[in-house]
Structure formats: C-alpha cells, structure tokens
Amino acid sequence: MVARRAAGSCPAHIAAGRLGEEAACAYLAASGMRILARNWRAGHLELDIIAQDNGTIVFAEVKTRAARGLESPHEALTPAKRSRLVRAAGMWLSSNDMWDRPCRFDLVCVTTEARAPEPEQMSLQAARAAGTAQARRAAGSGLPGILGKAASRLFGAGSPQRSHRAGGAPDSPEQLLRVEHIPHAFDLSESLGGGDAAWQPW
C-alpha cells in the first residue's frame, strides 16, 4: 500500500507516527478487518490497533521509520517489546471478557520518505487556493479531487496496491508512506505459557 499525506506543523516524529497509524488503520480496514480500538492504554502498556479478523482478535503493532533510518521497523519489535505487547493484550482480553477468543499479533511496517507534490496535485492546490472560476471549471470537467482519488484507490476492490492522498498548502512537501502488513509477526509460544490454546496467557 502507498499512502501520501501533506506534512503538518507538529514535530516530525510525532507527525510521522500519526500518519503511520492512520495508514495502518486504513489498510487493515480496507482488508476487511473491523477496528475495535486504537491507542489502547493500561498504565505503561499500550496497543496501537485492536481489530477483529473474522473471529480472531488482532493486536497490530505499528512501526513507522524513515526510509533512510538506521533501524528497520522489523528490528524495532524486540523481545522486550513482544513481552509488553503480550501483557497488554492479556489485560485487554481480561477487561473485555474475551479470554476464549483466538488472537494473534500482527506487525504493520510503515516506511516514510519526503516527496514533493505531483504536478497535477500542485495545479489543483494552486487553483483551490486562488478560489478562481477556473478551479470550478476544472472540477466540473471530470478532473478528480485529491480526496476523491483517495477513496477510489484506497478501497478499490482487487487492487494490488492502494494509495491515499491528502492535499495541503500549495508547494508543500508530502510524506510517501509505504505500508507492509505482516500477520502472525511472532510466535506466541516464545512468550506465553500453556493453556487451552497456545495464545491463551495462563
């Protein structure tokens, strides 16, 4: 999946994290999952995305990194991080009385890189900012708006890649987000004891 978002005014790492979580959430929803919660917290423990994939509860960890970063998103899922995810998932299952539900841990890797707006986007943004009649004529001529493209491409059935664009100020840089979804990101037997099923933490 490829997602493009205009850069915001908040600190770069916070903006990148938010964009990464939004892209991950949109990707999972477009894949047919039902999003149950985002940024669920219990003390110092946190779950980025909790979703339902048919009858399975999915705890999705989102890792966002710059394209030229020294650490890949995969490497950020350390054994210590896995242990915290398992503890957080156990607390969520307990608080929602869902101990009997099968669950899994997924990893959504989001890689960001700066990218200038495409010529078509720049012309659309400039026309909108000017508020001219020419912009209205362009809209009426079938030239799709940026958000219209997002809806059609993001949720287009059978599309091998999905793209998401959101416009910002004219000539503003964008972030190109590349999203990779890894189901069953790690083996639960590494962290959990035995139960009625391998994923049950008791």
Swiss-Prot record:
State any single GO MF term: nucleic acid binding
Q: Which InterPro entries match?
A: Restrct_endonuc-II-like, tRNA_endonuc-like_dom_sf, UPF0102_YraN-like
Provide an example Pfam family for this protein: UPF0102
Cystine pairings recorded for this chain: none
- The source's domain of life comes to Bacteria
UniProt-recorded name of the protein: UPF0102 protein Dde_1093
Source organism (scientific name) = Oleidesulfovibrio alaskensis (strain ATCC BAA-1058 / DSM 17464 / G20) (Desulfovibrio alaskensis)
Q: Which family does it belong to?
A: Belongs to the UPF0102 family.
